[in-house]
């Protein structure tokens, strides 16, 4: 079996909903980090790319009709290079990376690009066709996040709780209090701010040129979602599900825009094109859980991937646990034996501070983990995420 190595990884800044990247189409946004890979790796014969696999959770708007293929062409790769878009909702970007790695490990491919994209700001409203002629029962659905066009059988079998409702379910079932959630959220903001101030994200971010109505483009070079806060300020926020709820806008991830791309190669291709392997993709695993507590999906996914990798949680030097909600992140961490303030856990902040552009987030986790391993000299990193409709995904990296 071949080894699959990450040789380079880069992402756009993460934009706020309706923020600096809101005017950029998803396919154009996805092309940005691919172009950056091309520019940063001049020794590569890009006609040798076997496939481009991108994750995207929406695909109802400008990201329709295989956004990976669109981005491949828009980035200037040869038209002979194929592209495929995968959708495991929030886990799409990490899934794309794992799929690409498995293709290389099997020997079927040698050089791949994997990543993800999401423009939640530009997610469209959609309307289904009428069930009968001349019907006036048309319903418009917002595709930004969560359920739409719900199957009545799914509603009857599992319910269709919104994402914040699933977090409240987790908080209740796993006894995660409001104060603990707010403290976790504050740590995320503080760590993200420290990472930004120290320039830790510089190597992994490619600035995005955003066209303006007049004059020069606006260059966006910094994550837009982090915000200064205090425990007192967080405590004043009302629950988003119910007034006495524990899940608030302050201890939940954002609705965001962003894209990320990674260059993968086997050992021969890396040597042939003068690439430096930075991390080996050790293993990936997925798991299913009840949709109403989808946030705890990483528990079984992590246990499974560690079993496949033959490793333990104690061997992980970096743990990138996607912070969809503080409630679910705490529930996952505690179930796995990770302390709430573990220094290995999201050392540069997580999605509560940085944002969660759904299809891009998994690729972002792997990118940030790779650079963190290089900075600290750690050996192993764990990346894991919960997934809407009740799944979890986990991936292990080893620094080379």
PLM regions and their residue ranges:
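Flexible glycine-/small-residue-enriched beta->alpha junction loops
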Residues: 111-169
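N-terminal extracellular/periplasmic Venus flytrap/periplasmic-binding protein-like
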Residues: 11-12, 23, 27-32, 43, ...
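Beta-strand segments within the central parallel beta-sheet cores of soluble alpha/beta enzyme folds
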Residues: 46-55, 82-87, 112-116, 180-187, ...
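Condensing-enzyme catalytic core mediating Claisen C-C bond formation in acyl metabolism
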Residues: 1-24, 145, 230-296, 300, ...
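Active-site pocket-lining segment
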Residues: 168, 212, 282-353
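Conserved catalytic cysteine-centered active-site region
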Residues: 24, 56-112, 141-147, 157-163, ...
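Conserved active-site "lid/cap" helical segment
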Residues: 1-71, 75, 82, 166-178, ...
């Amino acid at each position: 079996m071949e080894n699959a190595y990450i040789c380079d990884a880069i992402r756009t800044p993460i934009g706020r909903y309706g923020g600096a990247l809101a005017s950029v189409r998803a396919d154009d946004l996805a092309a940005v980090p691919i172009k950056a890979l091309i520019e940063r790796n001049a020794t590569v014969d890009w006609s040798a790319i076997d496939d481009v696999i991108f994750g995207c959770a929406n695909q109802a708007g400008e990201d329709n009709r295989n956004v990976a293929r669109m981005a491949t062409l828009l980035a200037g790769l040869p038209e002979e290079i194929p592209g495929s878009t995968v959708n495991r909702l929030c886990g799409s970007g990490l899934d794309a990376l794992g799929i690409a790695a498995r293709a290389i490990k099997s020997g079927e491919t040698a050089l791949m690009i994997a990543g993800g994209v999401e423009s939640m700001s530009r997610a469209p409203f959609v309307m289904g066709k009428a069930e009968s002629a001349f019907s006036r029962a048309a319903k418009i659905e917002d595709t930004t996040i969560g359920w739409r066009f719900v199957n009545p059988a799914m509603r009857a079998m599992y319910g269709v709780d919104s994402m914040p409702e699933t977090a409240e379910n987790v908080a209740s079932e796993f006894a995660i209090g409001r104060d603990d959630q707010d403290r976790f959220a504050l740590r995320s903001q503080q760590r993200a701010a420290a990472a930004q101030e120290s320039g830790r994200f510089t190597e992994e971010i490619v600035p995005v040129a955003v066209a303006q109505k007049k004059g020069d483009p606006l260059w966006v070079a910094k994550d837009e979602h982090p915000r200064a806060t205090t425990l007192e300020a967080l405590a004043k926020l009302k629950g988003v599900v119910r007034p006495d709820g524990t899940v608030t806008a302050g201890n939940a991830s954002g609705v965001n825009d962003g894209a990320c791309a990674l260059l993968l190669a086997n050992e021969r291709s890396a040597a042939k094109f003068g690439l430096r392997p930075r991390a080996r993709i050790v293993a990936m695993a997925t798991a299913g859980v009840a949709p109403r507590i989808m946030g705890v999906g990483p528990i079984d996914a992590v246990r499974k991937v560690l079993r496949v990798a033959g490793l333990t949680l104690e061997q992980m030097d970096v743990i990138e646990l996607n912070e969809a909600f503080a409630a679910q992140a705490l529930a996952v961490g505690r179930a796995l034996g990770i302390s709430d303030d573990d220094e290995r856990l999201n050392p540069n902040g997580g999605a509560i501070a940085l944002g969660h552009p759904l299809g891009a987030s998994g690729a972002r986790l792997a990118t940030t983990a790779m650079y963190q391993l290089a900075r600290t000299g750690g050996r192993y990193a764990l990346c894991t995420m919960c997934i809407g409709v009740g799944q979890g995904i986990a991936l292990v990296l080893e620094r080379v």
